[in-house]
Each structure stands twice: as C-alpha cells, then as structure tokens.
Amino acid sequence: MIELKKYQRSAADNLRELVERALRSSENEVVVFQAPTGSGKTLMVSEALKGLVKQRPTGVGLSFVWVSVRMLHEQSKEKLERYYEDDRLLQCSYFEDLEDRKIAENEILFINWHSINKKDINIYVRENEQDNNLNSIIQNTKDEGRQIILIIDESHHTAGSDKSKELIDVIS
C-alpha cells in the first residue's frame, strides 16, 4: 500500500474539496491543480479521486476522462491501477476496454491528446457505423445520470486546441 506524505495528503484533500464545490455549482467549473515536478501529482490526484468516490451521495455517480500528452496516459493508467489495486474503488480503462459504449460509474477512461487532435486518425470523435466514438460514449454516460469529470494532464500543452475545446464542451 502506498502511503502519502503529509503535504500530499493535504493537497489531495484540498483538491477533493475544490472539486466537490465545483460539482455542486450550477456553472461549469474548472479546477486547476499544480505542483512541482516530482512532488507526486498523479498520486495526489489519485487520492483525491478516491475521496470523491468514497464520499459521493448515494445515486450520484461519477465517471472520469483522463487525457494526457504523448504516452503519459499509459504511464498514468499504470500508476493509478497500482494505487487502486488494494481497494478497487476505481477502474482504469482505455477506449477499447469500455463495455456498453459508456464509461461506468467510478471508471477512468484514459486517452492520449494525440488521438483527439491529430487529423485523420481521430478515432475517438469520428462517427462510424457502430456509433462507437467518444462523443457517443460521453452522451451515453451522461444518459446514465453520471457526472463526468475531465482531467487534463499537462494541460498547458494542449488544452487550448480547437479539438480540446470541443471535448471540454461535449463533457460539460
């Protein structure tokens, strides 16, 4: 079991409280979490997500979309799977792992920004015969009554692109 340092625990609790406040807001809120390189940001976010899931009122489910640059989505998924290994509170998945074309409650969908932003290989938002694309998956998840939290890892690199803004709009 991974033990958080005192500053990590404090930051994770703070982040969880900010996200809870944002979820209660009638506006689409943005929560930014910054910490120095090597401080354990992924670990702190993992703990905050675990706290969100544990403290949700009955009947109010959460699903998550985690988007990263380069191959960081794979690294993040592996870290989170190890972190959640003992209690299995959250499930980590790639697009092709999704069942029933939706993100399950307490499931984190890991995506690479490259898949969203690169022209002609955009499998996540291109319409196809199975209606198996990111927009449909997000809508199906919302139709289940779950709130979706978008986590943009390394957002300073990509969050401003047109496709990224489109994803943010679809989720909100």
For each feature predicted by the language model, list its residue ranges:
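RecA-like P-loop NTPase motor core of helicase/translocase proteins
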Residues: 1-172
